[in-house]
Curated annotation (Swiss-Prot):
Membrane topology reported for the UniProt record: Lipid-anchor
ARM repeats: 60-97, 98-137, 139-178, 180-219, 221-260, 264-303, 305-344, 346-386, 430-469
Keyword ATP-binding: no
Name under which the protein is recorded: Vacuolar protein 8
Keywords in alphabetical order: Lipoprotein, Membrane, Repeat, Vacuole
Species: Yarrowia lipolytica (strain CLIB 122 / E 150) (Yeast)
Keyword GTP-binding: no
Polar residues composition bias: residue spans: 27-36
GO CC terms of this entry: fungal-type vacuole membrane
PANTHER family hit by this protein: VACUOLAR PROTEIN 8 (PTHR47249:SF1)
Family of the protein in this entry: Belongs to the beta-catenin family.
Amino acid sequence: MAASAADRMGRQRMSGLSCSAPPRPTVVTNPGNKQDGNYAPVLAEDEREAVALLLRYLENRGEVDFFSNGPLRALSTLVYSDNIDLQRSAALAFAEITEKDIRPVNRDCLEPVLLLLQNTDPDIQRAASAALGNLAVNNENKVLIVEMGGFEPLIRQMMSPNVEVQCNAVGCITNLATHEANKSKIARSGALLPLTKLAKSKDMRVQRNATGALLNMTHSDQNRQELVNAGAIPILVSLLSSRDPDVQYYSTTALSNIAVDESNRKKLSSSEPRLVEHLIKLMDSGSPRVQCQAALALRNLASDSDYQLEIVKANGLPHLFNLFQSTHTPLVLAAVACIRNISIHPLNETPIIEAGFLKTLVELLGASDNEEIQCHTISTLRNLAASSERNKLEIVEAGAVQKCKELVLDAPRLVQSEMTACLAVLALGDELKGTLLELGIAEVLIPLTLSDNIEVQGNSAAALGNLSSKVGNYDTFVNHWNEPSGGIREFLIRFLTSGDSTFGHIAVWTVLQLLESKDQRLKDLLKNSNEIVDAIHQLSSMNSDGADGDGEDMRDSKSEVVMLAKKVAPLLK
């Protein structure tokens, strides 16, 4: 199952980091031009005043609000100066101020920073992008920066020959990309191609920020498609072998998100033959978060049958089995979600059982209070039971039925639904029906037909119906005719009169199995129940064509119920 998830699939995000802290700001007080061996002062009067004010503010920086009118005017004066030294001083001041004071700011605060960002001087670019990256930690600022056109100069800086400038620009874009409102704009801005290129940078800081930015772009299907079109897949796959744990984590998580989409899985399958091998290896990583994302990536890939087989053939099962032993809940959840998808393929049922998963799955079912883990666990058991009588027997022998009986009445609704579905599949095994009845599962299935969840009701009824067919000993049905919760009798009456064709079909079919059981006690109980007899006769006399507003499938379903009721009605006389 792909993730919604997610997901629940781990919508992981990273924040961009500045590559290096700019030096502390020093305000140039007497810049000039060399004339006859002397430096003549060239500051305008307003610049002199701004420098003096800024020096005073910096000396008392702990008590000054640099985003208020006076300090901001002084900084802006330096920004708009024609003097490069004053511009550098302003950029460095903004970088230091924003590192320590992150808050929502207005356009007046952002305008001078964005102007500095467009400067051609690398030192100014580096400090300005660091300041903007700091401001972009705040969600409100992220939106405003983009609205004010901050992308364009950042994209240009990503292509700078200066590594420090590159790194800070990418770090800023990484932060901006964590906001949902910005992601599609980034995807359309032309930033993905340089980001993808920088993900292969020789500078690990640039590579880390670029990979994190790519990860932040994988949280919507449209943006994922833009990313794939920009050629990100082969680069992300190559980064799985990175020695940097952050790069490994970002690339693994990005690929996991990309694999949510069926079209992308096909591209991965055709172009990346070693992807599964890389991900299996990463499940043995020393980093739990890398292990977790590797398992989730395999889970998403295993939404396709070819990948389900490939993971098993690539010897992925022992690595997943090891993750089951972890005490780290997210890791166990990722592993069991992966094995659930792998278990969908009939050819994988026996290898999974032979790898020793059954005992672990049953233990996990009872040991975990995590609803998702329980759902994935019991769903895996159901998948393993789907096509083999032998597998059904091994699942029962592993204690799965006793564990379900113990837990199901108090389990969350989703877990109840999965458990009753599993019991319904197990109840199809002709050689197991007597064993299941002896284990007492009717005692929990009957009350669950009263559930307020329609799936739990239907699954429980289907399990009872399956158990009623060709079982040697019908004592359980006789003994539970009236208890618990109204017993078999009330269950049949409710479903026969429900008006739901699926429920009606289950009930009529169950009545037929009980009548054909050759157990006279059951025949007498059925014939003496006026409500059951009347309900069967009423169903048998219905118009088999259904109502005018019914769709074709609904008409077919109702027709089957009517035909089955016509077969049962004479047997109740």
